[in-house]
Amino acid sequence: KRDFIDSRANLTQLLMEECLSGFPKLPKDTFVIWTGIKNNAETVENLYKGGKTPHCSSAYDFRSWLAGHLGLTNGGMEINAACASSTVGVALATQFIAEGKYDHILVAGADTVSRFVYYGFAALKAMTEKACMPFDINRNGLSLGDGAVALFLSVKRNTDIRVAGCGVTNDANHITGPSRDGAGLAQAMRQAIEMAGLGTDAVQGFCAHGTGTRYNDTMEILAARSVFGDLQPPMFGLKGAIGHTLGAAGGIEVALSGKCLAQEIIPPTVGCKSPESPEIVLEKMPFPGKNILTSNLGFGGVNAAVLMEKLS
């Protein structure tokens, strides 16, 4: 059992090391926001049974390890906003930099599939026995995935892609279920668009949470219609390709949306064959647009959105 728990911690660290392999050396005063949320579940179970704590088990442990691994000395914090954690982390990092609290922030997190997480979603009847089919009329649940993300935000311009706007809300609808009308998510989306200084008609792409569950995807479509009206931008989801990576999901989608802007393409919504709404992207398409809105939801009614913008 101890070896199993340590192996999960090691897998999280390996994911982060691979994720950071292409990073340049970061300034020592970089503040770290850790957004991995589920890596200590087996540790809690083991302690309950009288077992020992592995060398790295809590969010604090992983954040401290990451800072030490990178030689960073400016401290940090951990966020748990469920599956919107890294999206909220990006929003908070953007706010901190705008307020002059920090010049450089690393938003990072990794989550791996565990027995605890698998059983939890299975108990909610949210898992699919087949492939994940985001926004498909025949969808029947989500698929879990391992994933890691590291996003470096700086007061200095290091790239042509920037965070232009963020929004975070909580509709307090239910401990696990999304609000059926999408009002809280729509509010977060509008906040991000307004912060970017844009009108809703200026949003050119939308990367949605798209878990593949019945209620989530319908609610997201309702939220998008509420925000965009008849001027729906191309809407796509990534979880049919990579699975639901929990606390890392939003950050991965922010990063890949930045890649979409840089490479001028939008990927297909893998797994979707019969879309519930016509704006869902089914095939890879050219995308000369200058911005993409991303959004994520988490248990407890959390809604978060980030608007990514290409400057040139």
What are these regions (language model features)?
Residues 36-39, 110-113, 148, 165-172, ...:
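Glycine-rich beta-alpha junction loops
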Residues 127, 131-196, 204-205:
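Condensing-enzyme catalytic core mediating Claisen C-C bond formation in acyl metabolism
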Residues 1-10, 39-92, 101, 117-119, ...:
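Conserved catalytic cysteine-centered active-site region
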Residues 16, 66-67, 152, 189, ...:
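Structural element of the ATP-grasp superfamily
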Residues 29-34, 77-80, 103-110, 160-166, ...:
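Beta-strand segments within the central parallel beta-sheet cores of soluble alpha/beta enzyme folds
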Residues 1-18, 35, 87-158, 249-312:
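Conserved beta-strand-centric core segments of catalytic alpha/beta enzyme folds
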Residues 1-36, 40-41, 188-200, 227:
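Conserved active-site "lid/cap" helical segment
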Residues 175-181, 211-228, 247-252, 283:
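Short glycine/threonine-rich loop-to-helix capping motif typified by GTGT followed
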